[in-house]
Structure formats: C-alpha cells, structure tokens
Regions:
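Short beta-strand segments
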Residues: 12-46
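Short, small/hydrophobic-residue-rich motifs at membrane-helix boundaries and re-entrant hairpins
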Residues: 1-11
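Short, structured beta-strand-loop surface elements
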Residues: 40, 47-122
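A generic local structural motif
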Residues: 2-4, 29-30, 101-103
C-alpha cells in the first residue's frame, strides 16, 4: 500500500522503495526519488520522520524497484552537517512537489538522508 501523501511525488526518477516493517515484519512500499551527488546515491525524507524512515533505520537495507531488476541495497543515515548538498540536489530533482515540505521544515535535521549502496558494491568494498 502506498502512502497517499507521498504518492504526490510522482515525477521523473520515482522508484518504489521496499523495506521490511519494523513492527509487522511485512514488506512496506513507498515511492521515493533517489538522488545522486557525485558518485554516491541517497534517499531523502521530504516529510521528515515518516514510517519508511523508521523502517529503513531498523532494517538497514531495502530494495528499489524502478528500471529493470530490483536493486538490493544497504543504507547508512548521514549526519545532519552532511545533508545540505544532498537535500539541494533532491529539491532540484523533485521540484515543486516537495517545496512545501522544505518551507515548513527548513532545518536539514528534520529531513533524514540515507546513503544507499548497492549490495554488489557493498560486497566488493
């Protein structure tokens, strides 16, 4: 089931995040917009401390379904002082659909950001 407030993010680059629910143990799906900054990819939480954020923190891994095969990844939350550049890149990609979120919650600390690393990359590193 997709969160209706997040479904408004349907723009180019939207992928479906699947992460195990921290309480239910069941797969939870939500649309996200991965953003690349340099050679790293990230997931940004425009709505703040949402369910998918808490689930991803607990699980430490998930899957992205977008173009072709699902991508299994590990996730590492980045420190607040490292979020600004990633959030700026995200806002450019996501556009007006998320601007209200960032006006309401302007502090980068209100928007968890996870660096995602493909399981294949993680195994090699």
């Amino acid at each position: 089931m997709v969160n209706p407030s997040v479904s408004r993010l349907r723009t180019g680059g939207v992928e479906e995040l699947t992460v195990t629910g921290r309480r239910s143990g069941q797969p939870r799906r939500v649309p996200v917009i991965p953003v690349q900054v340099g050679t790293h990819r990230y997931l940004v939480a425009p709505f703040g401390e949402s369910g998918w954020v808490q689930n991803l923190r607990a699980a430490g891994e998930g899957q992205l379904h977008g173009h072709g095969q699902p991508e299994h990844f590990v996730a590492h939350e980045i420190a607040v002082d490292q979020r600004a550049e990633v959030i700026d890149g995200y806002r450019k990609i996501a556009g007006r659909s998320v601007e209200r979120c960032f006006r309401s919650l302007p502090d980068p600390g209100d928007h968890p950001v996870f660096e995602i690393e493909s399981r294949l990359d993680a195994a090699a590193g």
